[in-house]
Amino acid sequence: MNTSRKNPIGIYEKALPKQSSWLEKLAIAKAAGFDFVEMSVDETDERLARLDWTMEQRLEIVAAIQKTGVRIPTMCLSGHRRFPFGSHDEKTRQMARELMLKAIKLAQDLGIRTIQLAGYDVYYEEQDAQTIARFEEGMKWISEIAAASQVMCAVEIMDTPFMNSITKWQALADKIRSPWFQVYPDVGNLTAWGNDVENELTKGIENIVAIHLKDTYAVTETCKGQFRDVPFGEGCVDFVELFKLLKRLNYRGTFLIEMWTEKADEPLVEIINARHWIEDKMRQAGWNNA
């Protein structure tokens, strides 16, 4: 990990060539100038299977981390979109807990410090008072398991109305009251919903463990918004003002550039260009990240 940056800059695993090994992924990230990689455990069978990796497979990744010097400090655990804590189905809720326990064990084995949680009570089902109550119960349970395991869990600000602001996360956190239950905002999602970004980040700064960087198209009366695959600079996020604000707030956490270029013709070129673009906006904001 490049500790020369005051705020390390990482790249999302799904921005890297999909068929590459973990040693290759970390080496590519290093060659592209990134400090770390965020692992994805999404709702696909392929990536959920990572939770059942053998010890030999886990040690291979640890060896790759040691060889390259590029860490995997965070995990994006979006598998709960398929198996949500708020589900009406008891078996689905039980699977949600099993996934969480396995994710925490994987994090411990690989040295992952923070698991980003999906802020969905349900995704493919109808929401009601019971789904919300069960989700809150699940988050309380997670906070207890996280505390005992010494693995930070942090909720993402999402692409649906249920958890689309830091204010909404704080209302939940006030009920849970755990230092192991924090927030991991996505500035693209936060902006797309028309939030007062300055107010949201200011009120949440003491609880922000990391930040996702991506651009989005805003949700309006005539547009449902777009929450992924929006080229930097074409969406609604004012990155210069964002970095000015975070500089004033003395944010010292990591930045994760979130992209989905794993099947692109030249993903290496795209992620390097994205990093250069972000760092240029940081410089325009007066941010010296050397």
Q: Language-model segments: which ranges?
A:
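N-terminal small/glycine-rich loop or linker at the start of catalytic domains
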Residues: 2-12, 74-86, 119-123, 224
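Active-site-proximal loop/turn and secondary-structure-junction residues that shape catalytic pockets
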Residues: 15-17, 41-43, 79-81, 119-123, ...
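Short glycine-enriched, charge-decorated loop/helix-capping segments at active-site entrances
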Residues: 48-52, 89-93, 226-232
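A short acidic, helix-capping loop that chelates divalent metal ions and anchors anionic groups
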Residues: 44-49, 81-87, 121-128, 192-194, ...
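Active-site acidic/histidine proton-transfer and metal-coordination neighborhood
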Residues: 2, 23-24, 66-68, 83-183, ...
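Conserved beta-strand positions in the central sheet of alpha/beta enzyme cores
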Residues: 38, 74, 116, 154, ...
